[in-house]
Swiss-Prot record:
PROSITE patterns: RIBOSOMAL_L5. It is found in: Nucleus; Cytoplasm. Its main location: nucleus. The gene is RPL11. Belongs to the universal ribosomal protein uL5 family. It comes from the Eukaryota. GO terms for biological process: translation. The lineage of its organism: Eukaryota, Viridiplantae, Streptophyta, Embryophyta, Tracheophyta. This is Large ribosomal subunit protein uL5. Coiled coil: none annotated. InterPro entries: Ribosomal_uL5, Ribosomal_uL5_C, Ribosomal_uL5_CS, Ribosomal_uL5_dom_sf, Ribosomal_uL5_N. GO terms for molecular function: rRNA binding; structural constituent of ribosome. Component of the large ribosomal subunit.
Length: 182
């Protein structure tokens, strides 16, 4: 009995809640619509536009002007997109890419690295990947009736997220100093 491997608690397993792909163009117009087409082609969903919060004259941005687009992907499609994004980054992330709440994010320079064929009329766009991790039971904080808080022991921490990334994707986590030398 003692020699048997202890079963892990299925409630403690970490999973991807959602993946958010964001392209921030910084201006409205034709470049933004082409960026939204890239996201739609990549995810199969129609993207949502983000508006500027306030006017910045030096950037030429007015308040409530559409300046970025993003799409939220869940389930198996999110896992596939995350895998392709991490492949571009060669499964290497910085320690500062992970937040205290167990989320992490990274960016890529060119969307054509994900396997999309280059189209001269569209151009090349970089994008950000944001991954939100959770454990089973996080619904208690989101549900409408009898809303409650997730306990401190059950929350995903920065260390939990980094360990999950290293185990699941055999990823490498670099410090800032290591990233500059390579």
């Amino acid at each position: 009995m003692a020699s048997e491997k202890k079963q892990s608690n299925p409630m403690r397993e970490i999973k991807v809640q959602k993946l958010v792909l964001n392209i921030s163009v910084g201006e409205s117009g034709d470049r933004l619509t082409r960026a939204s087409k890239v996201l739609e082609q990549l995810s199969g969903q129609s993207p949502v536009f983000s508006k500027a919060r306030y006017t910045v004259r030096s950037f030429g941005i007015r308040r409530n002007e559409k300046i970025a687009c993003y799409v939220t992907v869940r389930g198996e499609k999110a896992m596939q997109l995350l895998e392709s994004g991490l492949k571009v980054k060669e499964y290497e992330l910085l320690r500062r890419n992970f937040s205290e709440t167990g989320c992490f994010g990274f960016g890529i320079q060119e969307h054509i690295d994900l396997g999309i064929k280059y189209d001269p009329s569209t151009g090349i766009y970089g994008m950000d990947f944001y991954v939100v991790l959770e454990r089973a039971g996080y619904r208690v904080a989101r549900r409408r009736r009898c809303k409650s808080r997730v306990g401190i022991q059950h929350r995903v921490t920065k260390e939990d997220a980094m360990k999950w990334f290293q185990v699941k994707y055999e990823g490498v986590i670099l410090n800032k100093a290591q990233a500059n030398t390579s």
